[in-house]
């Protein structure tokens, strides 16, 4: 076809390319554009995408392109934090499946997005001279299975991927405000006959902004006895949020509720906000109805590096279904927690904790026989000389023994077993694969799941009571993790985790686990 309704069309030669048509996109209006998330607009001859919260996209939909070259000039507004990314999308089959180049502060990362994962990395280059606040020219070409990425007229790399061959084009912003102009599309164009489809997402956001600075992290989810799900998480302005003028009490514990098995969530509310940075919360409802939220606290300390003191592990509880909460009680002054309290089959409570001294870390547990009113002295788990950061979670096995999984510092996590109800533990042994902040969960079929950070957000599963583990299963390409899981009413599993980076949010995905592996399920499909 010939494009005659836009500014100009010329025939040109591109390196290694056949004759192609060139379209200069008219940016005097938003005609032909689709902005699925909002936060994008045409303004003064520019496409403007505000990605300070979320990652807004803009698809140009009148035409589909094969053997395409997408070229544009872009600028990302300067900011102290955030990756300050502008992305170029090509071969968009729908709103979830496309190639894209992620131009951030100093990198150009070529990826493929699909229904299951938005970040299938193909190739990257770093150390680019690409300051924010300056206009740059980006370009991505896709001919057959060959992809090329350019910046400011220079070819950065060429690679191959056969997955996608044609579709729409577009742009996005990430953790910054991006401006795009001088958009030129070259290739074999044909008028699009169908609207751009947006398949249901494989994840939902539990919370994108709890009102404390738009940084949400370290989630934990459980089912309440009234059937609802509760997800607690840390809310602040960054990975550590000490009190300041904007957040006088520092980071806090927030929560959201779901009455539809995790598909939608209430706006965030504050569960606990002490005078310091309260973080890494976990939540459980005991058999007697008591709801306990455990967390740990950091207090600002000038002149130190890092600039805080740890105040240990704490808890608050509610005996009236969250109408009121107790005053905080300290569980331990020297140990910290990143996992939930577990109620054992005999009714006792056990909490995995951890400590570090002189560069050495180890896991530990503490026990309660009175529903959390008092806690035993901490029982250490010998790290066996392993380098552990040792965030510890516990699961009760079918034979009554207890299995502890511990965060690794180097190439592997650690594990230990107790055969006397948690009073003593075997020396930690290497699990054989890396992971941060493991979370253990048993499915209705008896499969034990262990979700963790590294690589990215991942999980393993065991069919033999933690004796052996599956190969790694990728959950998501975001790298925050600190995951948590709960069984839904249909037997599927909901996993929550966090994104990391400026504007980090809490995500949730749904899957079913069998002896054959893990199958991901759309979130909008009613459980």
Where are these regions (language model features)?
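Extracellular carbohydrate-recognition regions
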Residues: 20-37, 192, 520-527
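Extracellular beta-strand elements of beta-rich domains used
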Residues: 27, 183-185
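Short carbohydrate-recognition loop motifs
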Residues: 38-56
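Secretory/extracellular carbohydrate-interaction modules
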Residues: 52-114
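Short, aromatic/His-centered strand-loop micro-motif at the edge of beta-sheets
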Residues: 116-137
């Amino acid at each position: 076809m010939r494009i005659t309704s836009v500014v100009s069309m010329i025939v040109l030669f591109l390196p290694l390319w056949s004759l192609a048509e060139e379209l200069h996109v008219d940016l005097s209006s938003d005609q032909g554009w689709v902005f699925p998330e909002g936060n994008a607009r045409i303004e003064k001859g520019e496409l403007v995408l505000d990605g300070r919260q979320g990652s807004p996209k803009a698809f140009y939909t009148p035409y589909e392109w094969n053997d395409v070259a997408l070229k544009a000039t872009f600028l990302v507004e300067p900011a102290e934090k955030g990756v300050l990314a502008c992305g170029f999308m090509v071969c968009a089959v729908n709103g979830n499946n496309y190639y894209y180049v992620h131009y951030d502060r100093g990198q150009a990362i070529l990826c493929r997005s699909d229904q299951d994962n938005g970040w299938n990395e193909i190739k990257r280059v770093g150390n680019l001279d690409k300051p924010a606040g300056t206009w740059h020219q980006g370009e991505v070409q896709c001919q057959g299975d060959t992809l090329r990425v350019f910046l400011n007229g220079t070819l950065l790399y060429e690679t191959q991927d056969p997955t996608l061959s044609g579709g729409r084009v577009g742009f996005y912003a990430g953790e910054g405000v991006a401006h795009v102009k001088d958009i030129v599309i070259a290739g074999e164009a044909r008028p699009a006959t169908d609207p751009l489809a947006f398949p249901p997402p494989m994840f939902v956001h539990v919370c994108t902004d709890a009102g404390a600075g738009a940084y949400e992290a370290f989630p934990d989810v459980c089912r309440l006895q009234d059937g609802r799900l509760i997800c607690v998480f840390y809310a602040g302005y960054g990975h550590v949020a000490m009190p300041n003028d904007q957040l006088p009490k520092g980071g806090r514990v927030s929560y959201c509720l779901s009455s539809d098995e995790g598909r939608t969530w209430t706006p965030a509310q504050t569960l606990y906000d002490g005078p310091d940075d309260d973080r890494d919360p976990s939540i459980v409802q005991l058999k007697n109805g008591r709801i306990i939220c455990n967390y740990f606290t950091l207090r600002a300390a000038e002149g130190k590096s890092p600039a805080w003191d740890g105040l240990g592990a704490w808890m608050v509880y509610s005996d009236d279904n969250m109408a009121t909460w107790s005053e905080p009680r300290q569980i331990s002054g020297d140990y910290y927690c990143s996992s939930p309290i577990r109620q054992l089959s005999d009714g006792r409570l056990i909490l995995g904790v951890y400590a570090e001294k002189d560069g050495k870390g180890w896991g530990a547990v503490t026990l309660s026989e009175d529903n959390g009113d008092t806690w035993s002295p901490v029982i250490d788990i010998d790290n066996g000389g392993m380098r552990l950061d040792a965030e510890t979670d516990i699961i009760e096995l079918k034979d009554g023994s207890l299995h502890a999984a511990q965060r690794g510092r180097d190439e592997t996590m650690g594990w230990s077993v107790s055969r006397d109800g948690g009073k003593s533990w075997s020396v930690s042994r290497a699990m054989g694969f890396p992971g941060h902040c493991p979370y253990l969960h048993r499915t209705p079929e008896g499969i034990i799941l262990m979700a963790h950070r590294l690589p990215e957000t991942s999980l393993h599963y065991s069919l033999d009571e933690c004796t052996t583990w599956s190969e790694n299963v990728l959950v998501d390409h975001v790298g925050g993790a600190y995951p948590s899981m709960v069984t839904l009413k249909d037997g599927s599993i909901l996993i929550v985790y966090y994104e990391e980076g400026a504007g980090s949010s809490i995500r949730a995905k749904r899957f079913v686990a069998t002896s054959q592996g893990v199958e991901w399920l759309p979130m909008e499909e009613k459980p």
